[in-house]
Amino acid sequence: MKIAVLGGGSWGTALAHLLAGKGEDVRLWVRDPAVVEGVNRDHENPRYLKGLHLHEALRATCDAGEALEGADILLSVVPCQQTRTVLRSLRPRLKTGMVVVSASKGIETDGLRTVGEMVEDELAGLAPRYAVISGPSFAAEVVAGMPTAVVLGCADRDLGGTLREVFSTPTFRTYSCTDVRGVELGGAVKNVIAIAAGLSDGLGFGSNARAGLITRGLAEMGRLGVALGARGSTFMGLSGLGDLVLTCTGDLSRNRQVGLRLAEGQGLDAIVAGMGMVAEGVKTTEAVYELAQREGVDLPITQAMYAVLHDGRDPRDMVQELMTRELREE
């Protein structure tokens, strides 16, 4: 099976490596010629996964046409805010009925659309068959062959079963479900809560506060998801609770790192510029906040993070406001 992977960041590279190791014909589309050279010559992504050996069968290219030629599956791992532009530019090269799998986690800020909705918008008339893969999965650990479990959401149960097999290895276990919206929203909202968890840890608020943020963050994720048509049970799975716990506690989490650096007094622009990789939660906070306003859903942690990130509020003041909100049943 030929698979075109769009996006040569850490996660796109990790998934391309995983699939190449299974014997799939994988082409990784990357815009940076230095990354292409590193993957093809040195079997390493020098920018995002330096020091980790990639499968020698994996080939990278800057030529989108070369990557997409004859592809059975398009695996999109470009940052969420760039997805619409990339899909629009590649549409003339895509065939009708193509399988499109997203591994990006976020919500578009301009249109408040998930990746699946952007695929519907931009590939209308091509009848794409869509799926999303998400879950607790640091790229470096996947490349290192450490045990990982994720979930693949696909409305077509048969296609979901087929893709579940494609994306599974002895160290990478893929479950499937039909709740595409739930899988997408879990992967997006957890990034907002992860920034809050990093901020809390950086301010020295302790383990109790982190556990409270994770638990109440899960409640926010579920409330918004159900309001948008997802199943509440999905958020208790790998794309919800699983990814939330990992991203709020693991030091490889970019969004947690944003929170930690905010606690040190660094400015948001400097943090984002200095990371070298996309932390989806910064933009997603804005999108989730706007969605909550539109749907009339109460998301106090998200509202607090929006105030910190986009209104310049003092994090300690926002913690005080969260802790002194009107008391209620859980």
From Swiss-Prot:
Gene3D superfamilies: N-(1-d-carboxylethyl)-l-norvaline Dehydrogenase, domain 2, NAD(P)-binding Rossmann-like Domain. This is Glycerol-3-phosphate dehydrogenase [NAD(P)+]. NADPH binds at residues 10-11, 31, 105, 139, 254, 278, 280. It comes from the Bacteria. Belongs to the NAD-dependent glycerol-3-phosphate dehydrogenase family. GO terms for molecular function: glycerol-3-phosphate dehydrogenase [NAD(P)+] activity; NAD binding. It catalyses: sn-glycerol 3-phosphate + NAD(+) = dihydroxyacetone phosphate + NADH + H(+); sn-glycerol 3-phosphate + NADP(+) = dihydroxyacetone phosphate + NADPH + H(+). SUPFAM superfamilies: 6-phosphogluconate dehydrogenase C-terminal domain-like, NAD(P)-binding Rossmann-fold domains. Pathway: Membrane lipid metabolism; glycerophospholipid metabolism. It is found in: Cytoplasm. Signal peptide: none annotated. The active site is at 190 (proton acceptor). It is an enzyme of class 1 (oxidoreductase). Its EC number is 1.1.1.94. The keyword Nucleotide-binding applies. Sn-glycerol 3-phosphate binds at residues 105, 135, 137, 190, 243, 253-255. HAMAP family: NAD_Glyc3P_dehydrog (MF_00394). Keywords: Cytoplasm, Lipid biosynthesis, Lipid metabolism, NAD, NADP, Nucleotide-binding, Oxidoreductase, Phospholipid biosynthesis, Phospholipid metabolism. It comes from Nitratidesulfovibrio vulgaris (strain ATCC 29579 / DSM 644 / CCUG 34227 / NCIMB 8303 / VKM B-1760 / Hildenborough).
